[in-house]
Amino acid sequence: IDGVPLSISAWQAPREPVPFAEAIQNSFEPVSLGWRFGRAWSTIWLRVTGEVPMSWQKDSVADLAPEIQIDFGYNTSRSGFQAEALAYDLSGKPIKAIAPKNSWLPWSINNKQIDFYLEVAANPDVAGEYTFEPTSFGDWDTAPETALYELKTLQLSRRNVQVWELAQDIWTIRGLISSLPQDSSRRHILIRAIEDMLDALDPADVANSVASGREKLEGVLSSPAAPAS
């Protein structure tokens, strides 16, 4: 929920990746959302700055977790063969890796000033549709100069932790349902629990009804796989 824009500047490494200490000595130029970048196998450094809104600091809520959302135009149906990044603090200490299915960076509400670096590797999709046919993208010297990625999202947001936890609850129960026999009584109990959760959840106000929805799933999530002998 929410969304606060951040200031972004970039430096393109000439060819081979360089260490953090060398990269940050270069001149970073301002870029904005929609910027296209990253010919195959190139490395781009981003500096990201901003500030946590004062209203967030005053109204800090445990269930709202600040995080940096990052999207380089990812195809989230797959985890590899795309751009990946590593976030660093100002001292050069790695904070967290960024990838298509893991494209967020946690941020403390108490860390008012946002200032960090991203080392972005513009990996090309050499697999295609997993046919692994010959491709010019397999080598720097044969790859085209075309920019492969777009800076679609880079902002500070707040994630509703309880809504996220509900999504994990549902994912877990769906996994159980799919693994149980069709005539299993437990399978039907799980399906009924999902139905009860949906009845308790207000689709027009998920944030304020999520607790009621999760409550309907507590019983089936806490019960053992089989009765104790």
Task: Spell out what each predicted region is.
Residues 1-229:
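Carbohydrate-active enzymes and regulators
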